[in-house]
């Protein structure tokens, strides 16, 4: 095996292509690619990728299957066992649970975006077994964006930096260590004269690079977009030909945006009306214009409307036909993930049992059913797996786990997913996990979720596995990632676990691929190549449908056109047009509560050295950002009597957490930023330490998933604007 490999870094979710080389001492050196690449510009490597081998070889990595032999869940009494014993016992217990409660009693949380090695086989296993209850943190991070894109224009839309003359950024905190490849794409675009509009309450480095910076109030993005649409329509700046030929609902949209004149939008957002108009005109006239994905609008009370309004902005200025935006499709080189997943094997009565169907159906099988025929017409697949699809609602899943209503969920798998910390209302997630008869965790470290498991199975590292991207449909390009070294210890790939369990559950005939390499060869079989040859090409662009040409097939919506007025949302009983409603817990909507909780909370803002709840183990990455930090503007901190460098409590009506305070002039006055995913792996596990600090430091302790705090269409929690908080000394 050659020592130098071409690898897709999976340290975060941007997936930069890097080179990896095994040195004489056995350590792996990762560095930026040396040749031109269509998806990754030169010098695109961050500190997480540079130090990836320190995580792979960390002394605390789980290298062998472990069984908790304690008398109660969460008791840290671990016994090393074999894979065969673990799989045999898991299968036996799962069979008993299914016999008693039905297959829907299995719930699964999976992280697809950083794993990318099972190619739909987990959903295949669940569908054949009869469980619809798969969920992911993608429910509130890009997966929901993809869902909204689908109902609006059939598929997820990618911004093309190289083909854009104007970029609209929404709270994207790019840097040399955060989405570095896109940061380099941005700098290259600006160098050639591309315009940049930035919407961000914080004065970030990217905001300082902008032609127009709109420091809007947290959570008011939907209102600002509606104001921009108002300007573009009323000033006749839209692409009339595209709107007339390929959009439906324009007149209804035009009527709706009259409710959002610039003076009203300025009052809502806190931005200058003239600057909003200037941004709208720039976006419409500096064509082609694009809006790269940003997580901020995935996590708001008005999330669905904010995402819908972005789709509409792209459409009415012609971005889908001038090269600025690319509508994806199942990759032409690959067997569709949807075919592998076998959604048709899941009975209709089980689809209707998917948790969340009755309360927040949009992202479930029921909500997506209106897109089955259009997807089959355009893409040849009925169940289009576009960046996470057909998901159980996380709140409904954890509630069923905790309360056994509307029915019991008694077995839970966390696959590359720190599920305890990954969703809002961590208290309820803990109750749900404690109420399980079987918890299985597949991961690299003893995470807080793993500490609650019956079995912890050692997962492989991205330097230890070959990968064919993507692991979902709708991405117009793909990359191959070569295996650099064999997995450490007894670590296995995700497909190994899925297939071996499927065999023990009587499903072997549906898993004909004996190992991951056979599965990869099946996935790439349309090319006529096998992995040994295919991996050498490094990247591959998909052949996309002709959506909008003279013989265009249209998009995969019920009308075949971009639905400015959504027939899918109308059918589900939702507002078919975007809107802005003030969240129920702000200083405007609840001034009395704001007297006790005077701060507006913002959860997130990525840090350089970690990704979500990963890479907090002691070492070079943790040393860069050792503590969980809250950010307050110096004036706000002074008014509260809170000096920088002291530990504080941050409290909402839902809970509180302990953080180290740092004064930050970029943080808007009257607001507080809290980090996501912080815990202390160096601490002992178990309930005595709050599962290594997770119950003390993680943002989900203060984030409610009650109905008042959920986006009404998607049923996802508001994390980024519209939650009142207070801060005080410990």
Curated annotation (Swiss-Prot):
Superkingdom: Bacteria
Binding site for [4Fe-4S] cluster: 9, 12, 16, 46
Record InterPro entries: Acetylene_hydratase (IPR041930), Asp_de-COase-like_dom_sf (IPR009010), MopB_CT_Acetylene-hydratase (IPR037949), MoPterin_dinucl-bd_dom (IPR006657), Mopterin_OxRdtase (IPR006656), Prok_Mopterin_Oxidored (IPR050612)
Active site location: 13
Keywords: 4Fe-4S, Iron, Iron-sulfur, Lyase, Metal-binding, Tungsten
One GO MF term attached to the UniProt entry: 4 iron, 4 sulfur cluster binding
Claim: Lyase is one of the keywords in the record: yes
Cofactor dependency: [4Fe-4S] cluster; W-bis(molybdopterin guanine dinucleotide)
Keyword DNA damage annotated: no
EC identifiers of the protein: 4.2.1.112
Thermal activity profile: Optimum temperature is 50 degrees Celsius.
Misc. remarks from the entry: The tungsten center binds a water molecule that is activated by Asp-13 residue, enabling it to attack acetylene bound in a distinct hydrophobic pocket.
Binding partners and assembly: Monomer.
Family: Belongs to the prokaryotic molybdopterin-containing oxidoreductase family.
Protein's UniProt name: Acetylene hydratase
């Amino acid at each position: 095996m050659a020592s130098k490999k071409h690898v897709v870094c999976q340290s975060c979710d941007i997936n930069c292509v890097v080179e990896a080389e095994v040195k004489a001492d056995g350590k792996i050196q990762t560095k930026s690619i040396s040749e031109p690449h269509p998806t990754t510009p030169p010098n695109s490597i961050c500190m997480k990728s540079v130090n990836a081998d320190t995580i792979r070889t960390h002394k605390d990595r789980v290298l062998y299957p472990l069984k908790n032999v304690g008398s109660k869940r969460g008791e840290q009494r671990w016994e090393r066992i074999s894979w065969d014993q673990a799989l045999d016992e898991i299968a036996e217990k799962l069979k008993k649970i299914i016999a008693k409660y039905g297959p829907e009693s299995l719930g699964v949380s999976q992280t697809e975006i950083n794993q990318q090695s099972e190619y739909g086989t987990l959903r295949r296993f669940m569908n054949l077994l009869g469980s619809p209850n798969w969920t992911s943190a993608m429910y509130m991070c890009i997966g929901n964006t993809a869902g909204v894109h689908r109902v609006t224009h059939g598929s997820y839309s990618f911004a093309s930096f190289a083909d854009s003359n104007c970029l609209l950024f929404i709270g994207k905190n790019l840097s040399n260590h955060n989405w570095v490849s896109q940061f380099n794409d941005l700098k290259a675009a600006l160098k050639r004269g591309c315009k940049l509009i930035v919407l961000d309450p914080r004065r970030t480095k990217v905001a300082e690079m902008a032609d127009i910076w709109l420091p809007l109030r947290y959570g008011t993005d939907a209102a600002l977009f509606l104001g921009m649409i108002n300007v573009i329509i009323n000033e006749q700046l839209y692409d009339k030909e595209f709107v007339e030929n390929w959009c439906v609902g324009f007149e209804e949209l035009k009527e709706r945006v009259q409710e959002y004149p610039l003076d009203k939008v300025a009052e809502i957002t806190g931005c200058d009306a003239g600057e909003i108009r200037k941004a709208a005109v720039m976006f419409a006239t500096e064509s082609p214009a694009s809006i790269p994905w940003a997580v901020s609008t995935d996590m708001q009370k008005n999330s669905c409307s904010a995402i819908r309004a972005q789709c509409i902005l792209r459409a009415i200025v012609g971005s889908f036909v001038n090269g600025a935006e690319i509508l994806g499709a199942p990759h032409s080189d690959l067997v569709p993930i949807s075919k592998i997943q076998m959604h048709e094997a899941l009975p209709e009565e089980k689809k209707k049992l998917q948790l969340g169907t009755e309360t927040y159906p949009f992202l479930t099988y029921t909500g997506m059913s209106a897109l089955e025929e259009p997807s089959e017409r355009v893409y040849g697949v009925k169940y289009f797996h576009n960046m996470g699809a057909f998901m159980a609602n996380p709140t409904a899943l954890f509630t069923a786990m905790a309360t056994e209503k509307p029915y019991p969920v008694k077995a839970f798998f966390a696959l590359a997913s720190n599920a305890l910390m990954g969703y809002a209302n961590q208290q309820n997630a803990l109750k749900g996990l404690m109420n399980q008869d079987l918890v299985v965790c597949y991961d690299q470290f003893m995470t807080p979720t793993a500490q609650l498991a019956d079995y912890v199975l050692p997962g492989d590292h991205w330097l230890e596995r070959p990968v064919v991207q993507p692991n979902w449909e709708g991405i117009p390009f793909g990359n191959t990632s070569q295996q650099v070294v064999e997995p450490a210890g007894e670590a296995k790939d995700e497909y190994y676990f899925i297939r071996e369990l499927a065999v023990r559950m009587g499903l072997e005939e549906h898993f004909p691929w004996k190992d991951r390499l056979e599965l990869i060869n099946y996935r790439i079989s349309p090319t006529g190549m096998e992995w040994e040859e295919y991996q050498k090409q490094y990247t591959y662009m998909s052949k996309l449908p002709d959506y909008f040409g003279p013989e265009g097939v249209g998009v995969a919506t019920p009308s075949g056109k971009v639905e400015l007025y959504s027939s899918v949302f109308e059918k589900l009983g939702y507002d078919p047009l975007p809107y802005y409603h003030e969240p129920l817990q702000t200083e405007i909507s609840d001034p009395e509560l704001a007297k006790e909780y005077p701060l507006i909370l913002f959860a997130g803002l990525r840090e350089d050295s970690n990704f979500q709840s990963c890479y907090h183990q002691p070492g070079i990455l943790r040393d860069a950002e050792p503590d969980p930090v809250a950010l307050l503007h110096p004036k706000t901190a002074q008014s509260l009597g809170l000096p920088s460098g002291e530990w504080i409590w941050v409290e909402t009506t839902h809970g509180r957490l302990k953080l180290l305070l740092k004064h930050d002039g970029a943080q808007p006055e009257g607001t507080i930023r809290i980090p996501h995913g912080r815990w202390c792996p160096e601490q002992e596990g178990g309930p005595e330490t709050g599962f290594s600090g997770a119950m003390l430091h993680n943002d989900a302790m203060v984030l409610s998933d009650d109905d008042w705090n959920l986006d009404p269409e998607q049923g996802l929690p508001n994390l980024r604007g519209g939650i009142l908080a207070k801060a005080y000394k410990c």
